[in-house]
Amino acid sequence: MSRVSMFPTEDKRSYFERQRDQYIKNISASMEDVLNNLNALNRSLEHTVGLSQKSEELAEMWSHFYNTVNEDLVKTEDGDIEVDTTKE
């Protein structure tokens, strides 16, 4: 075997074909990066929505507690707050 056939030194493709293949590789790598970033964004948004729903539940619970406590309080003429003991 000749050494030239084992290790070809010149590419048989044209300059256009080599450049096209390089651009396709670059575009493919960029699209993969975009996909990975979109997946990370999606996970972040899902996490944010989950936290938002939990905070709404917590806010509703505190609102209910505040309204329940407020029903039993009465403001006196001098501005003090007292518990209304007349309700049963």
UniProtKB/Swiss-Prot annotation:
InterPro entries: DASH_Dad1 (IPR013958). It is found in: Nucleus; Cytoplasm, Cytoskeleton, Spindle; Chromosome, Centromere, Kinetochore. Its main location: nucleus. Keywords: Cell cycle, Cell division, Centromere, Chromosome, Chromosome partition, Cytoplasm, Cytoskeleton, Kinetochore, Microtubule, Mitosis, Nucleus. GO terms for cellular component: cytoplasm; DASH complex; mitotic spindle; mitotic spindle pole body; spindle microtubule. One of its GO terms (biological process) is protein transport along microtubule to mitotic spindle pole body. Belongs to the DASH complex DAD1 family. Component of the DASH complex that connects microtubules with kinetochores and couples microtubule depolymerisation to chromosome movement; it is involved in retrieving kinetochores to the spindle poles before their re-orientation on the spindle in early mitosis and allows microtubule depolymerization to pull chromosomes apart and resist detachment during anaphase. Component of the DASH complex consisting of ASK1, DAD1, DAD2, DAD3, DAD4, DAM1, DUO1, HSK3, SPC19 and SPC34, with a stoichiometry of one copy of each subunit per complex. Multiple DASH complexes oligomerize to form a ring that encircles spindle microtubules and organizes the rod-like NDC80 complexes of the outer kinetochore. DASH complex oligomerization strengthens microtubule attachments. On cytoplasmic microtubules, DASH complexes appear to form patches instead of rings. This is DASH complex subunit DAD1. The lineage of its organism: Eukaryota, Fungi, Dikarya, Ascomycota, Saccharomycotina.
